[in-house]
C-alpha cells in the first residue's frame, strides 16, 4: 500500500508538471498623436504616460478570461494633420488594435473618429472640441475636459479673479482653437466681459506683432488665445516686446512645461485651464509626477497622466467584460465604467463626455504650470 501511494504521488506530480502554462495573449492598444513637428512634446508626453501604464500592467500580470495578457502600445505619428490622422486611423484599424488612445488634436479627432466608429474601435481622446462627442457615436470616451468646461472656466476666472472688464480674442482657426475660443466667448459674455476685438491667425504662424500692435491700441485687460503652446510661447514674448499690459489666457493646450521653457519670464502673465484636479494636491499625483520624471528625465506636459489612466481603465474594462477581442462588449463596459485613476474618476455621459470633469486654473512659475492661488 505504501508503495502504491508513493507511485500515485509521483504520478500526480508528473501530471501537474505536464500541465500547460496559462495561455498568453498579446493585446495591442493604438495611440495617435503628433510625434514630430511643433506639438511633438505633447504627443510624446501622451505616449510616455501610456507606456508607463503598459509597462506596469505587464509587470503586474493581468489575466482576462483565463488568459495572461501582454499589452503592447502601437504609437503612430498623425503630425497634428487631419488627413494624416485619418490615414493613421485606418492603419490602426487594419492592425486590429483593441482600442485607441488619442487623437490629441480636435482637428484630427473629428474626421478620424468616423473611421474608428465605422470599425467599432473604442476611442479615448483628450481632444476637447464638443463636436467630437456630438456625432452620435457610441465608441468615444473623452478622458479629459471639453472646451465647454475649459473655456467656460476661463471666462468666469477673467471676471471674478482678474477683475477684467474687456477682452480680445485670438483664434488660430484650428478645430481646437476655434472650439475653445467660442466657449470662452460665450462664458465671457455671460460673465459681463466686453469683447472688444477678435483676431485670427493660423496654426503655423509665429509672428504676431501685427495682431498685437492692433490690440495694443484697444488696450484689453486680457487676451484669450485659442491655440497651442507652440504659438502661445512666442506670442507672450511678443506681447512683452510690444508693451501690452494684458494677461494672456488660454486652455489646456498652453498649460504645458514647454510654455514656460520657451517663453521664459514672459510666461508669468499666462493663465490657463486644465481638466482635473492638480496632481500635486494628492499623494498619488505627486508620486506620478516623480515617477514620470525618474523614468523620462523630463517634466510632464499635460495629459500623460490621463493616458496612463486611460490604459489602466482599458485593462479594467477588459477584465470586467471578460474579453480582449470583442470590441462591442468592451464599448458597453466602458460606457458604464466608474474607474478611479490618478487624475480623478472616469465615468461617461450618454455622449461619451467625462462626467463632472473638474478644471483647475494654472499660472506659469519657474517655467512650470502651478495651480493658481488667490
Predicted regions and their residues:
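Extracytosolic ligand-binding ectodomains
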Residues: 1-8, 23-374
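Repetitive helical segments and hydrophobic/amphipathic motifs
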Residues: 11-12
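Residues in and immediately flanking transmembrane alpha helices
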Residues: 15-16, 47
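Sec/Tat signal peptide C-region and signal peptidase I cleavage site
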Residues: 17-23
Amino acid at each position: 500500500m505504501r508503495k502504491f501511494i508513493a507511485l500515485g504521488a509521483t504520478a500526480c506530480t508528473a501530471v501537474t508538471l505536464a500541465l500547460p502554462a496559462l495561455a498568453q495573449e498579446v493585446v495591442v492598444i493604438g495611440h495617435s498623436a503628433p510625434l514630430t513637428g511643433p506639438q511633438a512634446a505633447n504627443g510624446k508626453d501622451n505616449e510616455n504616460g501610456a507606456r508607463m501604464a503598459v509597462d506596469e500592467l505587464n509587470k503586474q500580470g493581468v489575466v482576462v478570461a483565463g488568459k495572461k495578457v501582454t499589452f503592447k502600445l502601437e504609437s503612430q505619428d498623425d503630425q497634428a494633420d487631419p488627413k494624416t490622422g485619418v490615414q493613421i486611423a485606418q492603419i490602426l484599424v487594419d492592425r486590429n488594435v483593441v482600442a485607441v488612445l488619442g487623437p490629441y488634436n480636435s482637428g484630427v479627432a473629428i474626421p478620424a473618429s468616423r473611421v474608428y466608429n465605422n470599425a467599432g474601435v473604442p476611442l479615448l481622446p483628450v481632444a476637447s472640441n464638443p463636436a467630437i462627442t456630438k456625432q452620435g457615436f457610441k465608441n468615444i470616451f473623452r478622458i479629459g475636459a471639453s472646451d465647454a468646461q475649459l473655456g467656460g472656466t476661463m471666462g468666469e476666472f477673467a471676471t471674478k479673479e482678474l477683475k477684467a472688464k474687456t477682452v480680445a480674442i485670438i483664434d488660430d482657426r484650428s478645430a481646437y482653437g476655434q472650439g475653445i475660443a467660442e466657449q470662452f466667448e460665450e462664458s465671457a459674455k455671460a460673465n459681463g466681459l466686453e469683447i472688444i476685438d477678435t483676431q485670427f491667425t493660423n496654426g503655423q504662424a509665429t509672428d504676431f506683432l501685427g495682431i498685437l500692435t492692433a490690440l495694443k491700441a484697444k488696450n484689453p485687460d486680457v487676451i484669450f488665445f485659442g491655440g497651442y503652446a507652440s504659438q502661445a510661447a512666442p506670442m507672450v514674448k511678443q506681447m512683452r516686446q510690444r508693451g501690452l499690459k494684458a494677461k494672456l489666457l488660454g486652455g489646456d493646450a498652453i498649460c504645458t512645461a514647454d510654455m514656460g521653457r520657451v517663453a521664459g519670464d514672459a510666461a508669468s502673465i499666462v493663465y490657463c485651464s486644465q481638466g482635473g484636479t492638480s496632481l500635486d494636491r494628492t499623494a498619488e499625483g505627486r508620486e506620478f509626477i516623480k515617477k514620470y520624471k525618474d523614468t523620462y528625465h523630463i517634466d510632464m506636459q499635460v495629459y500623460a497622466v490621463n493616458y496612463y489612466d486611460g490604459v489602466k481603465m482599458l485593462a479594467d474594462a477588459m477584465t470586467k467584460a471578460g474579453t480582449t477581442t470583442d470590441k462591442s462588449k468592451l464599448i458597453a463596459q466602458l460606457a458604464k465604467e466608474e474607474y478611479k485613476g490618478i487624475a480623478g474618476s472616469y465615468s461617461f455621459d450618454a455622449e461619451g463626455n467625462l462626467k463632472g470633469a473638474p478644471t483647475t486654473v494654472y499660472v506659469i512659475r519657474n517655467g512650470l504650470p502651478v495651480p493658481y492661488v488667490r
